Amino acid sequence: MRQVTIPLIQSKSMFCVIYRSSKRDQTYLYVEKKDDFSRVPEALMKGFGQPQLAMILPLDGRKKLVNAELEKVKQALREQGYYLQLPPPPEDLLKQHLSTVGQNTSHADR
């Protein structure tokens, strides 16, 4: 009996490794390979501080990420080898409150 070898088609799954900044709160660096910062600019690494491993995340089959746009992350990883996630802008609660109070006052004056 003759054996037939069927070549396997290997699809390259896309993973990313996420590191937390030791210098900046809520700042994360996504790279393609664990401990490989070779494509990350030196100035960015200096400002980021010592990377602290947060998680390894498969990107294939995923529909969204919590605090980043999935397609932007994938594109940045392919094109530049990293993605930097910055913290969301701080909420200006006083401005929101004054805006709400102003709206309520204008409705009361009618």
Swiss-Prot record:
Superkingdom of origin organism: Bacteria
**The YcgL domain covers which part of the protein?**
14-98
Q: Which InterPro entries match?
A: YcgL-like_sf, YcgL_dom
PROSITE patterns xref list: YCGL (PS51648)
Q: Please state the span of the N-terminal signal peptide per the UniProt entry.
A: none
- One of its Pfam families is YcgL
Q: Known PANTHER family for this protein?
A: PROTEIN YCGL
What is the designated name of this protein?
Answer: Protein YcgL
